[in-house]
Amino acid sequence: FYKNGQLLVDTDVVTGNHNLGHDTKTGIYAIMYKERNATLVGEDYSSPVKYWMPFYANVGIHDASWRTTFGGSEYLNNGSHGCVNTPEANAEKIFNNIEKGVPVVVY
């Protein structure tokens, strides 16, 4: 995550589960809003998160306290439903420095 041209956060994440067809959709988006202490709800999950920053429909950047491993090929078999799961300390730093409208590039 860059702010004012300076790198603030460089972290491993887990994106959408490729093998289940939940890939995080590639594209250029913008942060829609940010919310503390949200509960993310889907057909088969309800996950409380401390830092929620959606950028496309119900897809966003958030902490994932239930995860112990981030990065690498984790997304292939143990990925998210499309969100960008981020270690809590890094999600907090992003949350505290990001604003509505900031571009998000997913590739």
Language-model features, listed with the residues they occupy:
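Cell wall/extracellular polymer interaction/catalysis modules
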Residues: 1-28
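Exported/periplasmic cell-wall-interacting domains
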Residues: 23-28, 33-107
